[in-house]
């Protein structure tokens, strides 16, 4: 049996206003990924409880733009290969080289845990790349997933790279809430942890965001970016290894930066 630890908390949108039409478009694309077959307007409308006219308008627009077609007349709609072309172009122009993914693969192999690359996005961090552990009991993260910047190890490894004034401005915008009993509830508490952890060079999350999940992260200032490389896994396996794994991540990242700058 495989047991997977997943960050399931959903970030509140705060001041961000979702554009419904765009959100619906992405929902539809993800539906095609799950269905793996042509879908009719009726099936799409029923899946999302959309008015038939709304589903028709979205589908018609995507057909007109060349993103959907009918493999068989009146047999439903399916994405065209234009999506693949776009994805390939984006991948080819990715600002991070393949060697960064290789570093995650190496560290996942050496530690036996899930490794991920995180980048700042306002008061959140977003996962850019993930290499999942092969262990039966493991932490799983999804590319594009967002987490609070102040309570996660990756987030604090990123905050540590900010100038004091910029960091203070970010911490001031955070809506502090108690995820777990040891969650940082003030900007001062976050700042104290950052100063305490700076001397060792890595940042830890002993279950302060999600129960049973521990994290370790180090800053990854690669080519002017302010990212973090982080490890996630079950508390029972990771907590006792905070120091050894933190030092391993720090050494590996320092070596990578020297070889690739």
Label for each model-derived stretch:
Residues 1-93, 254-259:
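N-terminal helix-turn-helix
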Residues 19-22, 76, 80, 93, ...:
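Short, structured helix-loop boundary elements
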Residues 31, 47, 99-110, 116, ...:
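Amphipathic alpha-helical regulatory segments at dimerization interfaces
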Residues 33, 155, 159, 163, ...:
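Short amphipathic alpha-helical signal-transduction/dimerization elements
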Residues 74-173:
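Amphipathic alpha-helical effector-binding/dimerization core
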Residues 179-180, 211:
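Intrinsically disordered, low-complexity polar/acidic regions
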Residues 186-255:
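Extended hydrophobic
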């Amino acid at each position: 049996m495989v047991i997977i630890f997943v960050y399931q908390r959903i970030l509140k949108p705060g001041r961000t206003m979702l554009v419904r039409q765009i959100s619906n478009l992405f929902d539809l694309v993800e539906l095609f990924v799950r269905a793996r077959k042509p879908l009719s307007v009726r099936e799409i409308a029923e899946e999302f409880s959309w008015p038939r006219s709304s589903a028709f308008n979205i589908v018609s627009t995507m057909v007109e733009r060349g993103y959907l077609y009918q493999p068989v007349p009146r047999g439903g709609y399916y994405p065209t290969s234009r999506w693949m072309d776009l994805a390939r172009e984006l991948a080819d122009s990715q600002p991070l080289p393949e060697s960064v993914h290789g570093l995650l693969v190496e560290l996942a192999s050496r530690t036996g845990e899930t490794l991920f690359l995180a980048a700042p996005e306002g008061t959140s961090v977003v996962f850019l790349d993930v290499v999942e552990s092969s262990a039966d009991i493991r932490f799983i993260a999804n590319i594009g997933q967002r987490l609070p910047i102040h309570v996660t190890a990756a987030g604090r490894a990123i905050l540590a790279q900010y100038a004091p004034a910029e960091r203070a401005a970010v911490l001031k915008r955070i809506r502090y809430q108690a995820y777990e009993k040891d969650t940082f509830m003030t900007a001062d508490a976050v700042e104290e942890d950052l100063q305490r952890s700076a001397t060792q060079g890595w940042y830890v999350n002993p279950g302060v965001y999600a129960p049973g999940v521990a994290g370790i992260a180090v800053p990854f200032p690669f080519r002017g970016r302010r990212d973090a490389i982080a490890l996630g896994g079950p508390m029972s396996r990771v907590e006792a290894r905070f120091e050894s794994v933190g030092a391993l991540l720090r050494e590996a990242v320092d070596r990578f930066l020297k070889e690739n700058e």
